[in-house]
């Protein structure tokens, strides 16, 4: 039988783990509205205990990134079944451990700034300054991480489809601002519960917070719709060719399939055909000239280096005449350290590829200017924003998401929808096994193809020059607030 001290000790471990699990489950799901606030409440409640912070971060990443396990089996790349299983599990555990360490470090900052005295006896002004600074620190942390290849999705991008109205604030504050808001909401719940538990007055704080919460949703839901037109029909080709089968497919097969897609595009008077990432092999050459302007994922050589690119073909072309190379590569999966080149080609079918320019602006001349995200690059909102500031009128996202499960598809869709909201731009999606379709400039889905089915479809994207507050100013307001609140914490004696 457990004694009371053992039960208390178990609770100290159990609740942070539960909080991380609930948060991980809520990412890019309809559970967000219930699970994420509870998860962040648990995070704040245990934030004075270092191991609690680590446990929360570890399980948050373990659950939200559990799709990494679906790398297994890698037997098609020459690994044994056991080696494949070990590799997949180790990659997932490493990412979870890294998440735990990052939340642990944030918890140390919370301990230094917040837990030197009783939070529930602090003056409101002092408490507000401290909590805003800690929340902004998390938001800035995600912003910095998003500029590295080790970031996929964080709190900032997690709330679609769970709360599309709160996500609407992204047109003002971006993903990092949404992240800050979520941390603040978690603290508000923690603070109310703590005051209630201590039999302290809390109704005014509860009502004020509730009014702010409602206002944020109303403000996030406000949008000026852009009149839709049907002047630029685009054909999208969801190939449904799994990555593991690409090694068995020759160029003649792809050319035949692409010919069918072109006929479909022409019969529907499409001005452009778009195909997913990695559709065309290196130096692909058509035996006959292309019949419709085409953007297709594929590979090309540059200075004896292999690049994954979106290749542009004008009518009559037999080989590409324009391109934009993928810049953000999946560590180990696509990009391996040069000193390991002789030992491995990485965990991909094509071997290690090299990155291109970091600019996501692409003007193939036969379409209006575009902001292009190739798969993993959809997580980099800063570069997409820069491309739109350079004149891009539409976001095109080409991806290759097989063999991963629906969880990754949902996260990819959540990221794509947030990029649309941030910049008030339609986002045309085309993936080998899905998701493919069209996302409206307010993040709502206009059309989405069925997963894991080969399909050709006509969509009508809007090309728009409109810019949001976030597009114009980016994360500068969040950085300004971070510096302001850091200064207040360091130099202003507010207790």
Please give the residue ranges for each predicted region.
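Membrane-embedded alpha-helical bundles of multi-pass enzymes
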Residues: 2-223, 405-406, 431-433, 446, ...
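Soluble catalytic domains of enzymes that build or remodel membrane lipids, polysaccharides, and related
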Residues: 222-473
């Amino acid at each position: 039988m457990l004694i009371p001290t053992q039960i208390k000790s178990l609770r100290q471990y159990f609740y942070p783990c539960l909080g991380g699990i609930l948060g991980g489950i809520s990412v890019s799901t309809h559970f967000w509205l219930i699970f994420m606030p509870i998860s962040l409440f648990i995070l704040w409640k245990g934030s004075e205990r270092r191991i609690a912070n680590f446990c929360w971060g570890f399980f948050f990443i373990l659950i939200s990134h559990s799709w990494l396990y679906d790398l297994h089996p890698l037997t098609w790349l020459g690994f044994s079944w056991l080696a494949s299983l070990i590799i997949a599990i180790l990659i997932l555990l490493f990412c979870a451990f890294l998440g735990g360490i990052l939340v642990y470090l944030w918890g140390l900052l919370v301990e230094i700034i917040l837990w030197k005295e009783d939070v529930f006896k602090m003056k409101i002004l002092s408490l507000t300054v401290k909590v805003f600074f800690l929340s902004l620190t998390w938001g800035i942390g995600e912003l910095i991480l998003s500029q590295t290849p080790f970031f996929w999705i964080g709190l900032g991008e997690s709330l679609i489809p769970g709360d599309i109205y709160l996500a609407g604030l992204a047109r003002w504050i971006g993903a990092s601002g949404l992240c800050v808001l979520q941390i603040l909401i978690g603290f508000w719940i923690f603070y109310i519960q703590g005051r209630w538990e201590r039999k302290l007055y809390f109704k005014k704080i509860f009502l004020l917070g509730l009014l702010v919460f409602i206002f944020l949703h109303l403000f996030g839901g406000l949008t000026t719709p852009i009149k839709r037109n049907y002047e630029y029909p685009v054909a999208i080709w969801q190939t449904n060719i799994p990555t593991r089968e690409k090694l068995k497919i020759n160029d003649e097969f792809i050319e035949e399939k692409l010919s069918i897609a072109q006929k479909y595009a022409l019969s529907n008077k499409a001005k452009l055909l778009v195909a997913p990432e990695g559709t065309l092999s290196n130096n692909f050459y058509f035996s006959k000239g292309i019949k419709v302007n085409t953007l297709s994922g594929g590979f090309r050589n540059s200075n004896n280096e292999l690049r994954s690119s979106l290749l542009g073909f004008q009518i009559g072309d037999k080989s590409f005449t324009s391109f934009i190379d993928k810049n953000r590569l999946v560590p180990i999966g696509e990009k391996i350290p040069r000193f390991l080149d002789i030992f491995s080609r990485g965990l991909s079918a094509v071997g290690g590829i090299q990155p291109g320019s970091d600019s996501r602006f692409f003007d193939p001349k036969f379409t209006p200017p575009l902001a292009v995200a190739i798969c993993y690059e959809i997580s980099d909102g800063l570069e997409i924003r820069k491309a739109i500031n350079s004149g891009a009128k539409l976001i095109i996202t080409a991806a290759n998401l097989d063999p991963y499960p629906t969880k990754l598809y949902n996260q990819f869709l959540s990221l794509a929808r947030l990029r649309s909201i941030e910049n008030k731009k339609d986002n045309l999606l085309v993936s080998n096994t899905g998701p493919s379709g069209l996302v409206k400039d307010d993040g709502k889905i206009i059309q989405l193809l069925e997963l894991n089915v080969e399909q050709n479809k006509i969509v009508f994207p809007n090309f728009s020059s409109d810019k949001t507050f976030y597009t114009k100013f980016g994360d500068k307001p969040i950085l300004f607030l971070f510096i302001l609140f850091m200064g207040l914490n360091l130099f202003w004696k507010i207790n």
